Structure formats: C-alpha cells, structure tokens
Amino acid sequence: MVLKAEHTRSPSATLPSNVPSCRSLSSSEDGPSGPSSLADGGLAHNLQDSVRHRILYLSEQLRVEKASRDGNTVSYLKLVSKADRHQVPHIQQAFEKVNQRASATIAQIEHRLHQCHQQLQELEEGCRPEGLLLMAESDPANCEPPSEKALLSEPPEPGGEDGPVNLPHASRPFILESRFQSLQQGTCLETEDVAQQQNLLLQKVKAELEEAKRFHISLQESYHSLKERSLTDLQLLLESLQEEKCRQALMEEQVNGRLQGQLNEIYNLKHNLACSEERMAYLSYERAKEIWEITETFKSRISKLEMLQQVTQLEAAEHLQSRPPQMLFKFLSPRLSLATVLLVFVSTLCACPSSLISSRLCTCTMLMLIGLGVLAWQRWRAIPATDWQEWVPSRCRLYSKDSGPPADGP
C-alpha cells in the first residue's frame, strides 16, 4: 500500500531487524505510543478530507455534465422541430456524437465518484483503501520491490515479553519522527497526484467545453438561418392567408347576395301562390254557389212545371168531361166551311157560260178539282177513329195553354 511504500523511503527503513514495530510499541506501552496514534489519526483525517474534496469536485463536474447533456437534448429537439427534413439527419448525427461523448464522460466521472465513495467508506471504517494503493502504484516514484513491502508488512519476531521493555527510550522518538515524516511525504505525493489528475481532468473538460462551444456556435448559426427562413416562410404564409381571407370574404358576400335574392324570389313565389290559391278557392266557392243556386232554381222550376202539368192535365180532363158539345162544334166548323167553299165553287162553275166549259183549260181545271175532292174524301175516310180521339185532346191542351194565364217566373 501507499503508506508501506512510504516507509521504505523513510529513515526508519534502515533500522535493524531487532527494533520492534509501532504495533508492538502501542501494544506494550500506552504512554509512548500516544504521538504515533495522533499522527495516524491526523493522516487519516487529511486523507478523508482530500477524498471528500475530490467527491465534491466530481459531483459538481457530474452535475455540470448532466446539465450540459440535458441542454444539448433540448436544443436538439428544438432544432429538429424547426429544421427542414433534409437537415434533420445532419443534426441527428452531430447530436449523437456529442451525446456519446457526454455519456462516456458522465460514465467515467460516475466510476471515479464510486471509487472515491468506496475509499471514503474504507477510511471511515479504519482500514486503508485499495484505491490509494492503486494511485501509489500508478506513480513511478512510489514503486518498490516486493521484498521490501514484505519486510515492512511482516510482524516483529517474537522476542519475548521483555523486548519492548529493554528498548532504550532514546530510539522511540526517532522511530516516531521517521514514521511521521514518511506519512507526510506520502500525503504530499498523494496530494500532488490528485492535483495532476485534477489538472488533466480540467484540461480535458476545457477541451470538451471548447468543442461544445464550437458546436453550440454552429448550432446557433443554423438556428438563426432556420429562424430567418421560417420568418420568411411565415411572412409568405401570412400574406397568402390574408389574400385567401379577402377572397373568401368576397365570395361569402356574393353568395349571401345571391342567396338573399333567391330567398326573396322564393318568398314572392310563395306569396303569389298563396294569393292564387285563395283566389281560386274564392272563385270555386262562388262558382259552386252560383251553380248550386242555378240548380236550386231549375229544380224549383221543374217542380213548378211538373205541378203545372199535373194541374193542366186535370183541367183538360175536366174540360173534356164538362164541355164535349163545344169541342165537337169546334171540330165540325172547319168541315162545314170547306163544304161551303166547295158548294160556292160548284155553283160558280154552273153559272159560267158554256163557252168556258168547252175550253180545254176549264175542262182540265174541273177534272183536277174533282180528283182532289175525291182524294180528300178517301183520305178522310182512311184516318181511324183512334187517331182522331188522340188528336182532339192534344189540340184542346194546346188551346188551353195558349188561352190560359202566363206561369210565374223563377
């Protein structure tokens, strides 16, 4: 271990083998071993402080790296959401490189932090940590042959219980002082090693920070270019949207105007149709009323005519029954007048001179008249009695209608 290697370089390494170790001193006498135990306690306290300091430094560095990784992730998401699809693969490739580097750094820091926690736990438990031995072995100034380590780590030979008592008091301060000097040298070397590692880590962090800054600058440039392009595209989109809104508003006005005109026409047509329906209903009602009135009038007239016909038939029957001689006289009067005319004609012919009789014209005339008289007599005799019976009442009816008072109007 580191402390054992420091013992080989200290003056106590040249002591003879019969000098007892500090373990035998501390076990034999409590008084003289006090300064040695105090030196060991101070060294352990210094080691714990250095390990705690390193743990704090690594924790802070781990927090910074994680914050940087989260910031890179947020920037990557923003760029991907705003970038063109042709630029997305390049941005993704650059982000993967940075993310891999950051993940490796974080894993390395976490491994170191875990080792420091283990060292601190071992120091708190009272045993020497193995990590300090590894740090000492990594330093070429701390290398030593294994025989010397075995020589120092071996316990003292059993020389009996009187050995510690026979040790002179002058040699004890020398052993303790050499031990304390070796511990101080080991602490200084460990501190220098830690400082060198911190410097190397700081340089590495600075290099990564410079690379991250350069990448951040490139991302900012790409972000500004994408922002300008998006602003121009947004301006064009806003202009096209404004034009589309104006066009849509104009079309809406035209459509509303035409729709209003169509609605007005439909309203007018409905109104005219309603008026026409009302007019047709009124006219049909009036026509039906007139037809009904005319029908009622005709019905009343027909009923009156039927009643009048019945009355006239009854009156004609009563007249025929009450005055048959008068009807017979009226029927025979034309015959008598005809016979009178014939007699007058015959007497006139007889009174004419014979010269007229001898003439052919007169002869033909006489013959024609005689033939007509014979035909009329034969025709009169051929008419049956039933026809005369039917003809006489009808003539009487017509006569009674013509001679009677006029009927009432409708």
From Swiss-Prot:
Its main location: membrane. InterPro entries: Testis-specific_TEX28, TEX28/TMCC. The chain crosses the membrane at residues 336-358. Residues 1-43, 137-164 are annotated as: Disordered. One of its GO terms (cellular component) is endomembrane system. Belongs to the TEX28 family. This is Testis-specific protein TEX28. It comes from Homo sapiens (Human). The lineage of its organism: Eukaryota, Metazoa, Chordata, Craniata, Vertebrata.
